[in-house]
Each structure stands twice: as structure tokens, then as C-alpha cells.
């Protein structure tokens, strides 16, 4: 294109952006991603409805046929695409991490940068192109996100393995997710994420930039199986897997297929996002011989683990323990392992040439399962009990591919397993009539007469509901887990104060349920939210605005037995800008952490703004902190936060070296009038947030402020009410 310089958009596209001029500028774009403006299917599109109309049997049949329909442009190893599709599904799901719930297979992100071009995803572009005719045939009845996972399941089934089940319901997104922090590195395979004694930063799980899990050659390419085991344990734990699940996943996945390192890796071309336009989204074009089939280079490793690479067997463990292993190198120069003394020669088939046979081979991360004492014990048990291995792999694979979907109620289709699994955070089914409008009014009156403050009511409801994460659909008010371990003991929830509030609400619940007729009941989960609503209404009334906060009963109360304490521990907030809470060492600024929390709550910038302003004056700060409480009339739902923040009569100065907290002094008298954190002052400092704050600080904003606060509040209270959105 010769006239690129004449394009009116060229300068805008290539010129400096605000972020280039001001690298530290707070980025709010993550609060507005995945809008209808980027969705070609439109706001009215209902994926669940489309999926329910899908002929799933026909789709599965087509996928089975695809497995052995080898294409000349990318021939199937061993005549079967199953191993390639298992890797595709694994890598789609394997980006999930428990720290913030981000990543995973839930939105089909493997189609977009950076994931479509990660070194660890090399040649998975071919898998997606092989799938395209089937996706094209079934159209919008199956999302790419669901198709990735279902194809992985069918691949396993086609090679003789019985999977645990499949739940559909993953709706595609249409642009890269910008909210996920993949690491600080600016180069592929760098590992600046570590500090101290190999301590992994923040919520990160993978060991290097561009890897899904760990380096198969060992830490930083050093072939040390014991050190690799340490990396494996840390990384898989951060992806919600225990030792048994980890061994099962590694061994189960490596029962099939091979790795690819036929020759010099320097002959492999650039990734899809860096490829020429004529490549049409394909990358890693190789100049080594034919560049495909037996000449394929992907990881640089050339490993075939078993004698039956397209059939489920126990041969992975048989080979792992029947041979003694020595370090060698692949044709591409990568570290791998082969049996000592030439043992096993001729037992493994070649992927493309029937006249060739090989010895089995292993990765450093495979040898780790024999070297690490805990992994070795599990591996030997699986060797001796293949049925236990098959069950463990089936369950771990299901968990891997469904972990980011949230509760079982979100799963769609006839293949959903009936068994309730603890990691799905189950809540009891609703088995009683719920309260009506008359009951709601009576309950709110009792709550307001119970001697609890607006601050207590609002804080408790927020603490319960705001555990929700839009990333993996965990947390939220349903289940009333705020009364259970570990949430009842979290420092941010002020356990002593929380127990008093819950005791009062439990008393009201017991009284109502004991006197209600017709089997009608109110759950504590519902009552906590209703109490928060009552507090908001009372505070609005004090501000001169009559409002009814919408309330949808139907939540139920989970038991401690339904609550995995260790699993829920990762939901404990280390920060919540909405409550002006910050604990320990953080890797982001207070304002960045506020945006991070808002994004997990699926909030927009206007919703974030109005909620912070409202929660401050309602007294919802953790531990009763006065930071950001810019009002002389607390527990009144006024716009005082914005009015006083934008008051030019106040000058702000930091009071600590890290500039986390600030004093606001009267410019004339010099007296301290307010204190604040970065999560407060950002609404006056950041030009976009200040523009929003000005709306709510205006003299005509009283009604709008309350109305918008109630709408955003209700959204948060109902974030985990998936049945309301069905």
C-alpha cells in the first residue's frame, strides 16, 4: 500500500498516544471492554438459547470424523489429530489462575493476541483452522470457547478414554482481554516475575512469559527434575490443582501424541500476530525441509512418551518406571531424556513413517514425577492402579476445562455430570416459597429497628456480595458464606463487628421462618442483602430522596461442608478501594488496585465512581477508617464526597513516604479538614474520573446520584444471581 502516508487515520494509529506521553496514567479502558460495540451478534443475541438448539450428537459425530481426516497442508501425527486438539483445549483452559480468577477457556481468548501468538501455543493456529469448517457449519449455536473444550473431550473419547462430562455455556468475546496481567517481562520466555527464593509475583502462575505452565526442559531450560518439580507444584497449585490432580494431568496428557523438534528452531518464522498479511493469521511458517509432518518444529523438543500415542493406556507410567533415564538432546538442541543403554529402542512408532521405530522419551518435567517423593508416590499408585489413574485424570481434566465457569447452574447441555463437586462452590437448591413484597417491607422495618447502623448494614451486604469475581464467576452473596470459614475471619470484614450484625440478622431470620405460613422462608443470604438495601433506603431518605432498592429473593445458605476453606481463602481481599482497604505489599498503586477490583466486579467507570462516592459517606470503609469520608453528615446518601473532593479551598499533601495517604488542609487556615488515600484522590486527579465526579458534584445531581448509586449497588448485589439473567 503505497499511499499509507495519505491515510487520514495513519498518523493517529502510529502517532503517540496519551499512554506514550504519560506512561503512568491510570488506564480505565479495562472497565469498558467487551461492549456491544465490538460484538457482531448484537445485544439481543442469547447464546444459551442458541446452544440449547444445537444438535450436539451431530456435532460430536463431525468432531470424531475430523480426528482422523488428515489434511495435506497439516498432516496428523500418527494419522490422528486427537493429541493436537487435546493440547489446544488444555492451553485454552490452562491460562486460568486462582489468584484473580482470570484466564481460562471461558471466552475463547486463544483466538486473540497475545495468546494466539505465545511461544507455548505454537502451531495451535493449525488446530483452530482445522476446526473452522465445523465451526462454520454450526455457526452461532456453538461458541469457539465451547468448541475448544468439547473438541478436547471428543479427542480423548476418540482415543479410548472416558471423560467425566462437558458443560457448555461459554459465550465468546470479540476482542483481546486487556485486564489480565501476564507479567512484567518485555521478552518472550523471560522470567522477571521471580524474586527472592524463586517467589512468583502476584497472581501469576506460569513460570515464564509466553508459557502456559512450566518450562518442559526445567527451570530456565536447566534440566533439573527436582527443581522442575518445585516449579510444577507452585504453578499447578496456582491453577487450583493439588498433587494428585497435577500428576494425573501431566501423565494423562502425555499418554497421547508427541512434541515437535525435528530441526533447527531458528528456521521457524514469526508468530501469527507478527506474520505477513498474506499468511492470513497463520504463523510459525518453517523453512526446515517441508515444515510439516515429520519436519515439524514447535517446542524444539522431540518426544514420544508411549508405545500407543493415539490410544489410552497406562504405558506412560510403565515407561517412566521401567527404564532408567539419561539426559540427551533433541535434533533442535533441546534437553530431553531417553532410556539408558539403548533400552526401549524400536518400541515407539514414528508419527509419519511406518518404516521407522523409536525409543520412548521423556521431558524433564516427566522425570520430575519420578524424582519428587510426593509425585513419585502418586505415580507408583497410578502405575499399580490404572483405574484410579483414569478416574483422577477424568476428574482433573473436567476441573481444568470448567474451573472458570463458576457454579454448576451455569453449565448447559446433556453431558453435564450429575455429581456435585466441592470446587464448584455449590449452594443448596431453592426448595421453599420466597418472601413477597409485604414480607420484604416487614423485614426491612424489623432490620431498621434492630439497633444496627446504616454503616453496619451496608458494610455487611457489601462484604458479602463484593467477593464476586466476574473472571471465574466465584464469590458473591448467594450462599451467605460470609458467616462461614474462612470469610467470617477475614481482617477486612472486622470479624468482631461482623458477628454482631450476623447475630441480629439470624435472630430476625429465625423469628420470621418460625412464624411464616405455607413453608415460606427467608435465607440469611437474602436477609443480608435486604439489610443492606434497607440501609441504603434509610440513608437516601435522610438525604431527602425516597427510593426503593430493587430486591430479588431466592438466594440460599451454603453449609460449611459445601465450602472448601482452602479454595475460598484465595478470595480474601488484600485490597478493596471501595472500602478504602489496602493490606501488605502491593504490586500496583491504590488507584490501579481500585480499577482492578472494579473490573472483577464488572463495573464501568461511572458505576465505580458513584459507588465509591456513596460508600464513603455511608461509612462502609474497612475498620471504620475516616479516609475519604468527606462529609459532616455520615450515613446520609449525599453527594458530599464529590462536592468536597472538588472544593478548591482544600489543598492536599502526602503524609507518608510512599504517598499512599494524604491530608486535605484548608487553604486559608491550614487546618486539616479531611484525610484520603490514592483511591479517593484519583477522582479529582484523573481527568476522566474528574469529569464523572463533576457530574455528581453538581447542584442538580442529588436525585441522579441516588438513582445511579442504587442501580450500581443492585448490580453488585445480584452479580452471582445467574438465574435472573437467564
Curated annotation (Swiss-Prot):
Whether Iron counts among this entry's keywords is: yes
A GO biological process held by the record: cellular response to hydrogen peroxide
Record's keyword terms, sorted: Heme, Hydrogen peroxide, Iron, Metal-binding, Oxidoreductase, Peroxidase
Q: Which GO terms describe its molecular function?
A: catalase activity; heme binding; metal ion binding
Catalyses which reaction(s): H2O2 + AH2 = A + 2 H2O; 2 H2O2 = O2 + 2 H2O
GO cellular component terms, alphabetically, are: cytosol
Q: Which cofactor does it need?
A: heme b
User: What positions does the cross-link Tryptophyl-tyrosyl-methioninium (Trp-Tyr) (with M-239) connect?
Assistant: 90-213
Q: PTM comment for this protein?
A: Formation of the three residue Trp-Tyr-Met cross-link is important for the catalase, but not the peroxidase activity of the enzyme.
Record text on cofactor binding: Binds 1 heme b (iron(II)-protoporphyrin IX) group per dimer.
Q: Which residues of the sequence carry a binding annotation for heme b?
A: 254
Q: How does it assemble?
A: Homodimer or homotetramer.
What does the function comment of this entry state?
Bifunctional enzyme with both catalase and broad-spectrum peroxidase activity.
Q: What is this protein called?
A: Catalase-peroxidase
Q: State the organism named in the record.
A: Bradyrhizobium sp. (strain ORS 278)
Gene transcribed to yield this protein: katG
Amino acid at each position: 500500500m503505497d499511499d499509507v502516508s495519505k491515510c487520514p487515520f495513519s498518523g493517529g494509529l502510529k502517532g503517540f498516544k496519551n499512554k506514550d506521553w504519560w506512561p503512568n496514567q491510570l488506564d480505565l479502558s479495562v472497565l469498558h471492554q467487551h461492549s456491544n460495540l465490538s460484538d457482531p451478534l448484537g445485544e439481543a443475541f442469547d447464546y444459551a438459547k442458541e446452544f440449547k438448539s444445537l444438535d450436539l450428537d451431530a456435532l460430536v459425530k463431525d468432531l470424531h470424523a475430523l480426528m482422523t481426516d488428515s489434511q495435506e497442508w497439516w498432516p496428523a501425527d500418527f494419522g490422528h489429530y486427537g493429541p493436537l486438539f487435546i493440547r489446544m483445549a488444555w492451553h485454552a483452559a490452562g491460562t486460568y489462575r486462582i489468584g484473580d480468577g482470570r484466564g481460562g477457556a471461558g471466552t475463547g481468548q486463544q483466538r486473540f493476541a497475545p495468546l494466539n501468538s505465545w511461544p507455548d501455543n505454537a502451531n495451535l493456529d493449525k488446530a483452530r483452522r482445522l476446526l473452522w469448517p465445523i465451526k462454520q457449519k454450526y455457526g452461532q449455536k456453538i461458541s469457539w470457547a465451547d468448541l475448544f473444550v468439547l473438541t478436547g473431550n471428543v479427542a480423548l473419547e476418540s482415543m479410548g478414554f472416558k471423560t467425566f462430562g462437558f458443560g457448555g455455556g461459554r459465550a465468546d468475546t470479540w476482542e483481546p482481554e486487556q485486564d489480565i496481567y501476564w507479567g512484567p517481562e518485555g521478552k518472550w520466555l523471560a522470567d522477571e516475575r521471580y524474586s527472592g527464593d524463586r517467589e512468583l509475583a502476584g497472581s501469576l502462575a506460569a513460570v515464564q512469559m509466553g508459557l502456559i505452565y512450566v518450562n518442559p526442559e526445567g527451570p530456565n531450560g536447566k534440566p533439573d527434575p527436582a527443581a522442575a518439580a518445585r516449579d510444577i507444584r507452585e504453578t499447578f497449585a496456582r491453577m487450583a490443582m493439588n498433587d494428585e490432580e497435577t500428576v494425573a494431568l501431566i501423565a494423562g496428557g502425555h499418554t497421547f501424541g508427541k512434541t515437535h523438534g525435528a530441526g533447527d528452531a531458528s528456521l521457524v518464522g514469526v508468530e501469527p500476530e507478527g506474520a505477513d498479511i498474506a499468511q492470513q493469521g497463520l504463523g510459525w511458517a518453517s523453512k526446515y525441509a517441508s515444515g510439516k509432518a515429520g519436519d515439524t518444529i514447535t517446542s524444539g523438543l522431540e518426544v514420544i512418551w508411549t508405545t500407543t500415542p493415539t490410544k489410552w493406556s497406562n504405558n506412560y507410567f510403565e515407561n517412566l518406571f521401567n527404564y532408567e533415564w539419561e539426559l540427551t538432546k533433541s535434533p533442535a538442541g533441546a534437553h530431553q531424556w531417553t532410556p539408558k543403554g539403548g533400552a526401549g529402542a524400536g518400541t515407539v512408532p514414528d508419527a509419519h513413517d511406518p518404516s521407522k521405530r523409536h525409543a520412548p522419551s521423556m521431558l524433564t518435567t516427566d522425570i520430575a514425577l519420578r524424582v519428587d517423593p510426593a509425585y513419585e508416590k502418586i505415580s507408583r499408585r497410578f502405575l499399580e492402579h490404572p483405574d484410579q489413574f483414569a478416574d483422577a485424570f477424568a476428574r482433573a481434566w473436567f476441573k481444568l476445562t470448567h474451573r472458570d465457569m463458576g457454579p454448576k447452574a451455569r453449565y448447559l447441555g446433556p453431558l453435564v455430570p450429575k455429581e456435585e463437586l466441592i470446587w464448584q462452590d455449590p449452594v443448596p437448591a431453592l426448595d421453599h416459597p420466597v418472601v413477597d413484597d409485604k414480607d420484604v417491607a416487614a423485614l426491612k422495618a424489623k432490620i431498621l429497628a434492630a439497633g444496627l447502623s446504616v454503616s453496619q448494614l451496608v458494610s455487611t451486604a457489601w462484604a458479602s456480595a463484593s467477593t464476586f469475581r466476574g473472571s471465574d464467576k466465584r464469590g458473591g452473596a448467594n450462599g451467605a458464606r460470609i458467616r462461614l470459614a474462612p470469610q467470617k475471619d477475614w481482617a477486612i470484614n472486622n470479624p468482631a463487628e461482623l458477628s454482631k450484625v450476623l447475630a441480629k440478622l439470624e435472630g430476625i431470620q429465625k423469628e420470621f421462618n418460625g412464624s411464616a405460613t405455607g413453608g415460606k422462608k427467608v435465607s440469611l443470604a437474602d436477609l443480608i442483602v435486604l439489610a443492606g438495601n434497607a440501609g441504603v433506603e434509610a440513608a437516601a431518605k435522610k438525604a431527602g430522596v425516597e427510593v426503593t432498592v430493587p430486591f430479588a429473593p431466592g438466594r440460599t445458605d451454603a453449609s460449611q461442608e459445601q465450602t472448601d476453606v482452602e479454595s475460598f481463602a484465595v478470595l480474601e481481599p488484600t485490597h478493596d478501594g471501595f472500602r478504602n482497604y489496602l493490606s501488605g505489599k502491593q504490586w500496583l498503586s491504590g488507584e490501579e488496585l481500585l480499577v482492578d477490583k472494579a473490573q472483577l466486579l464488572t463495573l464501568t467507570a461511572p458505576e465505580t465512581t458513584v459507588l465509591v462516592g456513596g460508600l464513603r459517606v455511608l461509612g462502609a470503609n474497612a475498620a471504620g477508617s475516616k479516609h475519604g469520608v468527606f462529609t459532616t453528615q455520615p450515613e446520609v446518601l449525599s453527594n458530599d464526597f464529590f462536592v468536597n473532593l472538588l472544593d478548591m479551598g482544600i489543598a492536599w499533601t502526602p503524609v507518608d513516604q510512599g504517598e499512599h495517604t494524604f491530608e486535605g488542609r484548608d487553604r486559608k487556615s491550614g487546618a486539616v479538614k479531611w484525610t484520603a488515600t490514592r483511591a479517593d484522590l484519583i477522582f479529582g486527579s484523573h481527568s476522566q474520573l474528574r469529569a464523572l465526579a463533576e457530574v455528581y458534584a453538581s447542584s442538580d445531581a442529588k436525585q441522579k446520584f441516588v438513582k445511579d448509586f442504587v442501580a450500581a449497588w443492585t448490580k453488585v448485589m445480584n452479580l452471582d444471581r445467574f438465574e435472573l439473567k437467564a
